[in-house]
């Protein structure tokens, strides 16, 4: 059996690693680098270029140079319309995504392009190891859906690799980080790469790696930060020269490269120069672009993206039923975590300084190599327990969603439930497979349907139909329905079981929690009413007790009447506002009372007055 390699197939860069002498080692590519750009290009003569050499010629050949392809893999065209606008090459398709290659007058699937990157990594690994590499463990973002995982496996197959395991990137990072950890730790992996964002919380220690929860955003990454800068540069150039560069593919490619370079530089310096001579040619001569960008402006331009990093962190903590105090260590993964504002956000949200001991570019591939070592038997005593991100079930009588596998269940897993017929003499059942957190089928994501025929006629409720859900270690789902009376069986493998955008996932979770949120809202309303009634009571008592000036008393009485009316009309917004107003009025009553006391009982001996500060005894 040959060596099994671990591959981090990244949006921007890819890395390959292997176990050597019981330790994971990152393999240097043919060009002498430890990371390989995930870029494929075709020249006018039909030559294929992969990696650094492809990236270098991108400015001169933007329409035939393909990068950030991971953002398109395993997706429908209507899911990637925004991402398609961010690249200079042409992305087309009716349903499935196609990438146009004018140089060859053909088009490719994203899997085919990714396969070229995988093939180069495998070839470089083969030269390093000294024997052909045919098996691999490949990483994917934790929030990749089933079709994206399947497409990644297909890319490996096209590259001539047997993909033994698909492993989540944050989980791989935890393997690399926690390989030699003996004591138990709860770690949060914050993985912000070139095109995707994941957060996973794991229990790590003594060879056991258990994922407690995962969250993410498959539409957020370093590319989006670059896009913000490119848009800014285009606007600045238009102000200076009155020229719109949005349709100039070569200029866009140069701006994209300049944006990426500026982003990287601003991680270590506070200001950088962008100089692009001959950016545009006009009848009056060439136009150059020179500008200065400081870190503060970069952070301002990217503030919405940085803020989006907060939600998955909070969601992961909530799903794991943990607070920030429960997190022992924070591990940063992905080149985009080098952005100072991102690190500051992580530190602010979790109140913890992130670990600097791992290389964010290499740690995922290192973890994949550890998993490869486990599969090859080279690494012993490692137990990896990952989870599925959303609940899975079937539609039952009344349109109800009956959950069979609940969200954040450890995988691989197999679970079965017994169901029966809804009418007398029913000889077939339709199994409608669903994904989501809501109580009714119509509110969840439909994954597919299949029919089980040949059920023996019987009164309703008598036949026993066993429905089994099976999720393998790669996260791929299959469903089987079996009539226990006749032995008839039918199954379906769900390809695309998690074809959901981050927005859909968030919506499902939010809607599932709607009842809890409604209870909280009702409780807040009751508390507000109680507060209002208490303030009215207190104000009326004080008005009776203290003799106030008419010009002070009249407005307070008016506020009390308005608040009583607002309570009757259930106008809670007005109740809140008037409560604050009445609270301020009560403070004024106190001031009036004390000022009267001071004027009616003057101090005979001012020297007897002692200035003192009092602290409340607890």
UniProtKB/Swiss-Prot annotation:
Cell location: Plastid, Cyanelle
InterPro entries: ATPase_NBD (IPR043129), Chaperone_DnaK (IPR012725), Heat_shock_70_CS (IPR018181), HSP70_C_sf (IPR029048), HSP70_peptide-bd_sf (IPR029047), Hsp_70_fam (IPR013126)
Keywords: ATP-binding, Chaperone, Cyanelle, Nucleotide-binding, Plastid, Stress response
Domain of life: Eukaryota
Segments of this protein annotated with the region Disordered: 595-618
Family annotation (Gene3D superfamilies): 1.20.1270.10, 3.30.420.40, Actin, Chain A, domain 4, Substrate Binding Domain Of DNAk, Chain A, domain 1
SUPFAM superfamilies tied to this protein: Actin-like ATPase domain, Heat shock protein 70kD (HSP70), peptide-binding domain
Pfam families membership: HSP70
One GO MF term attached to the UniProt entry: ATP binding
Family: Belongs to the heat shock protein 70 family.
Its job: Acts as a chaperone.
Protein name, entry field: Chaperone protein dnaK
């Amino acid at each position: 059996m040959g060596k099994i390699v671990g591959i981090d197939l990244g949006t921007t860069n890819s890395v390959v690693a292997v176990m050597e002498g019981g330790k994971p080692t990152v393999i240097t590519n043919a060009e002498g680098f430890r990371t390989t750009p995930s870029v494929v290009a075709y020249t006018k003569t039909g030559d294929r270029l992969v990696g650094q050499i492809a990236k270098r010629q991108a400015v001169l050949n933007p329409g035939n140079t393909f990068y950030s392809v991971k953002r398109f893999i395993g997706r429908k065209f209507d899911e990637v319309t925004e991402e398609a606008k961010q690249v200079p090459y042409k992305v087309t398709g009716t349903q499935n995504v196609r990438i146009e290659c004018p140089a060859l007058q053909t088009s490719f699937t994203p899997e085919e392009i990714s396969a070229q990157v995988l093939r180069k990594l495998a070839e470089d690994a083969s030269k390093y190891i000294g024997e052909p590499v045919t098996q691999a463990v490949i990483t994917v973002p934790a929030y990749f859906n089933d079709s994206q995982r399947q497409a990644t496996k297909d890319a490996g197959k096209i590259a001539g690799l047997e993909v033994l395991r698909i492993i989540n990137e944050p989980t791989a990072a935890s393997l690399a980080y926690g390989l030699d950890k003996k004591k138990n730790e709860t770690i949060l992996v914050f993985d912000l790469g070139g095109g995707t964002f994941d957060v996973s919380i794991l229990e790590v220690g003594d060879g056991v790696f258990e994922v407690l929860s995962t969250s993410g955003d498959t539409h957020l990454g370093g590319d989006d930060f670059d896009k913000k800068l490119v848009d800014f540069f285009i606007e600045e150039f238009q102000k200076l020269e009155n020229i719109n560069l949005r349709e100039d593919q070569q200029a866009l490619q140069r701006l994209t490269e300049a944006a990426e370079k500026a982003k990287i530089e601003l991680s270590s310096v506070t200001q950088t120069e962008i100089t692009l001579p001959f950016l545009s040619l006009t009848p009056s001569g060439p136009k150059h672009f020179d500008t200065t960008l400081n870190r503060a402006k970069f952070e301002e331009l990217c503030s919405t993206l940085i803020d989006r990093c907060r939600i998955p962190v909070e969601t992961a903590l909530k799903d794991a039923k943990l607070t920030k105090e429960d997190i022992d260590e924070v591990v940063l993964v992905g080149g985009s975590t080098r952005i100072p504002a991102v690190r500051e956000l992580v530190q602010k949200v979790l109140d913890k300084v992130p670990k600097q001991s791992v290389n964010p570019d290499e740690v995922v591939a290192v973890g994949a190599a550890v998993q490869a070592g486990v599969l090859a038997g080279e690494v012993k005593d490692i137990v990896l327990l990952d989870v599925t991100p959303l609940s899975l079930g079937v539609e039952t009588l009344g349109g109800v969603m009956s959950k069979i596998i609940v969200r954040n269940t450890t995988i691989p897993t197999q679970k079965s439930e017994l169901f029966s017929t809804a009418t007398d003499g029913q000889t077939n059942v339709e199994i409608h497979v669903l994904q989501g957190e809501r109580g009714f089928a119509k509110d969840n994501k439909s994954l597919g349907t299949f029919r089980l025929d040949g059920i023996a006629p019987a009164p309703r409720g008598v036949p026993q139909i066993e429905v089994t859900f099976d999720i393998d270690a790669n996260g791929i789902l299959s469903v089987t329905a079996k009539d226990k009376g006749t032995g008839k069986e039918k199954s379906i493998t769900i390809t695309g079981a998690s074809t959901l955008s981050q927005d859909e996932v968030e919506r499902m979770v939010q809607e599932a929690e709607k009842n809890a949120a409604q209870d909280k809202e009702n409780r807040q309303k009751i508390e507000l009413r109680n507060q209002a009634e208490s303030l009215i009571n207190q104000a009326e008592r004080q008005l009776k007790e203290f003799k106030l000036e008419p010009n002070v008393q009249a407005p307070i009485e008016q506020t009390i009447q308005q608040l009583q009316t607002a309570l009757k009309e259930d106008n809670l917004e007005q109740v809140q506002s008037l409560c604050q107003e009445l609270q301020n009025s009560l403070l004024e009553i106190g001031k009036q009372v004390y000022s009267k006391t001071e004027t009616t009982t003057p101090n005979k001996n001012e020297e007897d007055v002692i200035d003192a500060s009092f602290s409340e005894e607890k």
